[in-house]
Each structure stands twice: as C-alpha cells, then as structure tokens.
Design a protein with these regions (language model features):
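Bacterial Sec-dependent N-terminal signal peptides
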Residues: 1-22
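Extracytoplasmic beta-rich repeat domains
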Residues: 23, 30-33, 45, 51-64, ...
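Short, tryptophan-glycine- and acidic/Ser/Thr-enriched carbohydrate-recognition patches
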Residues: 35-39
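Glycine-rich phosphate/oxyanion-binding loops and their immediately adjacent helices
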Residues: 73, 87, 112, 196, ...
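Beta-propeller domains
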Residues: 75-77, 82-84
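Short loop/turn segments that connect beta-strands within beta-propeller blades
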Residues: 83-87, 122-125, 166-169, 206-210, ...
Length: 370
C-alpha cells in the first residue's frame, strides 16, 4: 500500500512539474520553432486587469517568457524584463524603436530593432552578449536552429537578406538574398527555413549552408509568418489569399480568398489537429480544414485583426485593433467572452502561468487573469 502511495505521489509530482514548465515558459512568440501558435494549457475565463506596466511608447512586440521573467520590446527602444507581478527586473536601451518580438534562446534574449541591429542579452540581468548589424530595419522575431554543437539564429531584415548568425558568438554564418523586404519571421522544421517575403515568394532554405531549396510563388506580398505542420506550410498574403503549400512537392495544395473584401492577412496562422485559424484586416477570424481548405467558420471581431491568434485544443484567443481580447470556441467560432482593453493591439498575447500578457498602442504591458 505504501509503495502504491509513493508511486501515485511521484506521478502527481511529475505532472505538476510538466504543467509548471508549460505555463511559465513561452520562449518563441508563436510557442515553437514551427510557429504554430498552439497552447497546451487552458485560457482563463472572466478576466480582469491584474496589473499594467507603462513603457515610453507604443508596444507592437509580442511577449515571451521564461523562468517567471516576461520579455517584451517597446517602440521607445527599450527591451523590458518584468517579473510575474509586473515589477521591472531590468531594461536595455537598443537605441531605436523595437517592433519585433524577442526570442529566448537558452538563457539569452535575442531581439532586433529598427536600426537593423540584432542583440543578444543575458536573460538574468540584460547585459549585452553581442550585437549583429544588418543594413535595414528588423521587423520580425528571430528563430533558432540547433544541430549537434551548432546553434544558429535566423532573422530577416528589410535589407532583403535572411541572416544566419552564430547564437553564441554573434558572428554571421551566411546570408540568403531575396528580392524585397523580409517582414515575416522564419518557421523552422528539421534543416529547413520557411519564410515569405515582399517579393511574393515563399522561400525554402537549407539551414546548414544557406542554399535555396525552392521558391514557391504566392504572387503578392507576404507580410505574416508561415506556420508549419506535418510537411505543409500555411500562410496568408497581402491580397487576402490564404494558401496551403506542400513542402515535399513544393507547390500550392489549396488557396482560399474572400473576393468580397480582398483585405490583407497580416497575422500568422495557428494550427491544431485538422484546423488552421487566421485573422484578417476585414475584422474576421477564419477557421479552415487544413487538409481541404474548406471554410469551417468565420467570426466578426468588430475591428481589423493584425495580431496572430493562439489556439488550444478547444479555444482560440484573438485580439483586434479596437483593443478587444476575445476568446472563441474552436468548434464553431462562437465568442465565449470578450474584454475591452481600449487600446489597439498589434501583436499576439502570451498566456503565462494562467495569465494573459499583452502589449498595446497606449504603451502599456497588461496582465489579465481571473
């Protein structure tokens, strides 16, 4: 009997530890290197503001978090590190506005600014490890690829290049040239980087050597990041098209567009099981069957949606440019609750330790919970 009790106690402890890791760490602004936007925890109901922290200007960056530290950039040029009580741990001045989200790699914060500089900072105290300079602004969050003893940071720039940087030293490994601005983040699967550009292509690049694997024509600007799932990429475009690309065959499997509006998809999609979800500037959030492209439901949020949604096994968390935070039922798109923050929200929130963390145009970083 005592042995059974010990085994059960250990199982509970393991579950608790796993759950704790899941709730306190959100190291990539979309949750993982495939940029799927999937949350394996529940989203709180009946939320209210628990605290807010005022920065010096608009917050367009999405939050990331690790070890109870929240990292977010502001257009005042600072990277802010807050604890879960909303108190400042440290801040770092990058010298120019930050619109990109950060990446937490190991115990370091990687983030770019509008001067085109990419910084590596120590998570604990914000001390600079290195600075890498591109030739134009960085709007996208970096991503990380590791193989053996090599770790590379991948980030696009408005200098038309995808930059590959040694994560430890900050030295450039290679550059891949596109034909226009790179606004979106890179999605990564195995040895492949997948990203869209303002040149109208979805690029597939081999990470170890930086060589082009393929360019798939989307035919218009791709401002948002793609997400990857089971050998397929899902991405929206500036003309209001939403595409599913077979990465093995290197061709478009299906494409959907709303001919009535034709407004851009700025947001990145989220995927869970057979559903893929994305918001549009026409105020709607769309849910498609990821295999067929069939429209399963759409929901009018009341204002344009630039921020990417987050998805759980049953719910969708989305924000809009009116300043609303909405929780939708994944099954049918029904609005379960909405909270009026009152200031436009540019980028996706994070859910950390049962709390929703999000930045807004009014310069505040908000924490909402039960």
């Amino acid at each position: 009997m005592n042995k059974q009790i010990i085994i059960i106690a250990l199982q509970i402890l393991v579950i608790y530890n796993i759950s704790g890791q899941q709730t306190t760490n959100w190291e990539n602004f979309r949750g993982n290197s495939q940029l799927t936007g999937y949350l394996n925890i529940d989203i709180p109901n009946n939320v209210d503001i628990k605290w807010m922290y005022k920065t010096g200007s608009e917050v367009k960056s999405s939050p990331v978090a690790k070890n109870n530290k929240i990292i977010i950039g502001s257009t005042d040029g600072y990277v802010y590190c807050l604890n879960m009580q909303g108190k400042l741990v440290w801040k770092f001045n990058t010298g120019n506005a930050i619109e990109a989200s950060a990446l937490i790699y190991d115990q370091n914060v990687i983030i770019g600014n509008l001067s085109g500089s990419l910084f590596s900072l120590k998570l604990d105290d914000g001390i600079k490890n290195w600075e890498y300079k591109t030739e134009n602004q960085i709007m996208a969050a970096p991503n990380c690829w590791t193989s053996g003893n090599k770790s590379y940071i991948l980030v696009g720039s408005y200098d038309y290049y995808l930059h590959c940087i040694d994560a430890r030293t900050g030295k450039g490994a290679w550059k891949y040239e596109s034909n226009n601005y790179l606004n979106a983040s890179v999605a990564i699967h195995e040895n492949r980087a997948v990203f869209g550009g303002c040149d109208g292509f979805l690029h597939l690049v081999n990470i170890p050597d930086g060589k082009a694997e393929a360019k798939i024509e989307i035919a218009t600007y791709v401002a948002g990041s793609a997400c990857l799932d089971n050998g397929f990429a899902y991405v929206g475009d500036y003309d209001g098209g939403f595409s599913c690309i077979n990465l093995g065959e290197k061709k478009i499997s299906w494409k959907w567009s709303d001919e009535k509006t034709g407004l851009p998809f700025i947001a990145s999609p989220s995927v869970y099981n057979n559903k893929v979800i994305i918001g549009n500037r026409n105020k709607h959030v769309y849910c498609f069957n990821k295999n067929s492209g069939e429209l399963l439901w759409k929901t009018n949020t009341g204002e344009r949606v630039d921020a990417s949604a987050l998805v759980t096994s049953t719910k969708v968390l989305v924000t809009n440019m009116r300043g609303d935070i909405l929780l939708l039922d994944l099954k049918d798109g029904k609005i379960l609750w909405s909270y009026e923050l009152g200031s436009p929200i540019f980028s996706n929130p994070a859910v950390i330790d049962g709390k929703i963390i999000v930045g807004a145009q009014d310069g505040n970083i908000y924490c909402l919970g039960n």
